[in-house]
Amino acid sequence: MKYFELEFTITPCSQVAQDLLSALAGEVGFETFEESQNGLTGYVQQSLFDESALQQTLACFPLDDTQIKYDVREAEDRDWNEQWEQEGFEPIEVRSERSGVSVETLIIHDGRHLPSDISYLPSTLMIEIDAHLAFGTGTHETTQMICQALLEMDMKGRWVLDCGCGTGILGICALKLGAKKCLAYDIDEWSVDNTRHNAVINQVDDKLTVLHGDGSLLDSVKDSYDVVVANINRNILLQDMSRFATVITPQGILILSGFYEADIPLISEKVNGMGFWHLKTKKNGDWACLVFQAL
């Protein structure tokens, strides 16, 4: 496959800005990133490159004092997917902050890096993620916080909606914690295929349905969901909040992440205004996770 290489210059450059840019660019087709001194280098398949979508994303960048410019060139031939598949990621451990839960520890790993030196107790849950790309493996703080929030809940018998599923890790986590059913969707076709693949690996494919599309899919959904999780950027969360409110059950739980700590007031105001009660705030670095309950 032929790729474009985009050199992003971020002013001022910070780890937060780099993380946000990689997350947002990933939603418009970018597959791989390398950090540089002044920003990021991103790689996208030439056939999937949508420059207008990228420009719109940059125009709505959440950090108001940050400027982003980029140069485009054709990348040298290189199998980026194969490189990631060979390298994979080291096992990740997520622990519940709440005592007395049935599962206290979640271990996320890939097939090439099996966990070692851990106790396989009933209170430990294992999830294997075969990520053909680096997104949604559990390495990011936002994914870890939502997984932690799920560990701290009683998921038995719940119906779950996973919005912007990526690799499917959140829906799979919910199902392995006892959820009855999960509907997941993602705008990226690769994510849809990868979620289905990971559901098979974790033996929950009979309970997980994956759709290709954006939040507008919820306009035709007839079921209601006890738990709605969304790990998406701030602007999409705000755009789709009314849809989340429509498909959640009374007393249902809404778990949101994918945004910066500074965005908490904006997100909270929007959600509270739609009939939700704030339950919990989690923070990891500069990232945040908010948990709400429908009234």
Language-model-derived ranges and their functions:
Residues 45-49, 53, 156-159, 244, ...:
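Accessory recognition modules or surfaces
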